[in-house]
Structure formats: C-alpha cells, structure tokens
C-alpha cells in the first residue's frame, strides 16, 4: 500500500511540476523575448556542489532563468533550493521549450530543448554501465549536444566507445 501511495504522490507532484514549468516559464518568455531558460536535472544523489556553484553564478545574470528538477533519489540535496520542482524521470519529455537542459547523469528521455548538456564527473575509465547496456548508453549520449568530461582519460575512453558503436 505504501508503494502505491508513493507512486501516486510522485505522479501528482510530477504532473503539477510539468504544468507549472510549461505555463509559468513560457509566460515569462513572452514577457521577455531575451530570456533563456536553463533546466538542471538531478536524477540521483551524487556530488553536486560544483553544479550548485554554477547555478548560483547563472542566477546573477539578467536574462537567465534557472530551474531545477529532482526526484526521490536527489530530493535531500536539491529541494531546498530556489525554483525547484519534483519531476520523475519519465516526465522530462513533457517539459517544453527550454533553452538548455543540463544533467550530471545520463537520462534516456529529454525535455524539448535547444541544447542538451551532459556533465560527467568520473575521472577514470571505469565502466559506466554493464557491457550489455553499453550500446544503448552510447546511443543516448550521442543525443546530447555537449558532453563535458573531467579528464583526458575519460575523453579517450568515451571516444573509443563511440568508435566501437
């Protein structure tokens, strides 16, 4: 019973977030044609301090609106910040017309955005997924417009994986 309540709660919170993000921020863009909307998504609990610092810097800019999405896996770290929305992974595709989508974790479905950015924090060539899922991961990564990697080792490893598939 508790699991069903969690699922229903997650659905309702995600639905509320999708509606609010799509209408409120679209309205803000109508009022300010130069406004750029950047959506940071935090699907898992991991080290995020450097991304939070980036968000704080971006919020100082005049024509940039930063919004944050989180789910149960990352709620403790993110939900207390300004302009945050609960959004389960499957609901990202319902977010429309944002300028930049950014995540430090590979997501397989994206919101409608001009630019999709993946920031990887691994500094080694450790496997990202099981070998049987690697092809799907690389295919998904190829959908990102920009990929930021933290070391030459990680860059070399990703190039090899892309060449392989």
Which role does the model predict for each range below?
Residues 35-165:
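Active-site and donor-binding regions of nucleotide-sugar-utilizing enzymes
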């Amino acid at each position: 019973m508790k699991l069903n309540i969690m699922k229903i709660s997650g659905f309702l919170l995600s639905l509320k977030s999708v509606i609010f993000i799509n209408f409120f921020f679209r309205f803000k863009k109508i009022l300010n044609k130069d406004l750029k909307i950047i959506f940071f998504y935090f699907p898992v609990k991991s080290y995020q301090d450097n991304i939070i610092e980036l968000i704080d810097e971006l919020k100082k800019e005049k024509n940039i609106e930063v919004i944050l999405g989180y789910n149960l896996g990352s709620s403790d770290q993110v939900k207390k910040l300004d302009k945050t929305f609960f959004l389960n992974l499957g609901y990202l595709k319902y977010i429309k017309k944002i300028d930049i989508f950014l995540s430090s974790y590979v997501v397989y479905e994206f919101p409608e955005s001009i630019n999709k950015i993946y920031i990887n924090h691994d500094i080694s060539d450790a496997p990202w997924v099981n070998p049987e899922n690697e092809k799907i991961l690389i295919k998904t990564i190829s959908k990102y417009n920009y990929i930021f990697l933290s070391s030459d080792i990680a860059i070399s490893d990703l190039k090899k994986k892309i060449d392989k598939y």
